[in-house]
Amino acid sequence: MFSIIIPIYNSENYLRYSIESVLNQSIGFKENIELILIDDGSVDSSPQICESFKNLYPNNIKIMKIENSGPSAARNCGLSNVSERSKFIGFLDSDDAFSQNALQSVYDFFCDSEHVNIAVLPVYYTGEKEGGHKLNNRFEKGTRVINILNDYKAIHFYIGGTFYRRHTLTSTVLFDESIKFWEDAIFFNQLLLKEKRYGAVAEGKYFYRKRKEQDSLVDRSWFNKKRYTYLLNECYMTLLMDSFNKYDIVLPYLQFLIVYHIKLFLYPNYRDVYKSVLDQQEQRVFVDDFIKVLKFIDPQFIKEQDMPMYYKEFMFHLLKENTEALENIKKERVLHSSCTVTSAKIKGLRLELTGHFINQYYEMKENDRIYIKYFKRLKKCKRKELKKTIEVWGYKLRDFRYAGFVVEIPIWAFAFDFVLKTPNDSLELNHVNIFKSLLTRVFKKR
């Protein structure tokens, strides 16, 4: 009934865990599951682990061996070895796992939704990180069919935990082995552009292992030239053109997906790496192509993203868009922002507080001031200049030089409010009980 494909490369530490999650499926392994293990040139004990499981279940497990060719080639090898009797195909990575009810949940969904050919599971982290993936909000309404023409925010771009009716993955539907980045997102979303809908199966779970060495590999990928202009053109532009050719527009779903992913280029750990990887001419081409991709995006889908405001401002800046729409959001959000107390020192009968008002929505100006309000008194804080800015690709997005403050208040005024005063406005910010905060820290340490 199910064929589960696992590409394997040097996965000895977690491979048993992954395979056993398939063996333990409540739907019944011997009766309903074919497991296809593709050894992609492993040099550890992964091949021996595969053989040990095949000896236990010779009728259910296939082992294929290829030279080290990458996950796309391994998955394609798996697809070409799916049995004729299989009705559904699923993908699992060699250090991840399925919940025990995963395949039964997917099977029930496909039985109930005969017109839907793709299904996905919610992702939960295991290992170095725990909790649910940010995109799991799609599953909050329970198991359902998502039509991407209507629900453009329900984006998906990873391959583990995805399932397909066998007839959907014909001999022409393969992973592009020439693409070295984001190949799983290309595969899934090119197919989704044709299908238009997929099932969000809320009952099952896909456990994605978060590892330190994995993070290290991700970090190293930013030092590969193909992570830049190549990714923009061969991945983002490929999807944009596919949508344009099929629908005569770039679907909002794809616009939202690409902005969600392209923001990675702006993250503090990555945004300046390109300068050490690309020469000056390549840097200019990269930035030009970055802007070229953004020009396919309606500013609405930038504005709606859950990301820091200054990333949105930077994208608007590159597009030469009016930021008035963002300014309205910033005015609303600054009311919910807080001053931070970084130190509190007792000086006789007085309390010296040092802190700052740094947030993504507001940059304090020279004539702005922070005040402390205790009882009916309003006390002006002294300014403490900070050397903190946020710059992306040479463009200064925030300068927090005026955001610091220092103030002395009577020791008995342990509860107070922060107030931001500008030439045109006065905004009450957060309430602070300094003794309560100190007690909380003490109990946390215990």
UniProtKB/Swiss-Prot annotation:
The keyword Transferase applies. Pathway: Cell wall biogenesis; poly(glucopyranosyl N-acetylgalactosamine 1-phosphate) teichoic acid biosynthesis. One of its GO terms (molecular function) is glycosyltransferase activity. It comes from the Bacteria. GO terms for biological process: cell wall organization; teichoic acid biosynthetic process. Keywords: Cell wall biogenesis/degradation, Glycosyltransferase, Teichoic acid biosynthesis, Transferase. InterPro entries: Glyco_trans_2-like, Nucleotide-diphossugar_trans. Involved in the biosynthesis of galactosamine-containing minor teichoic acid, a non-essential cell wall polymer in B.subtilis 168. Belongs to the glycosyltransferase 2 family. This is Minor teichoic acid biosynthesis protein GgaA. It comes from Bacillus subtilis (strain 168). The gene is ggaA.
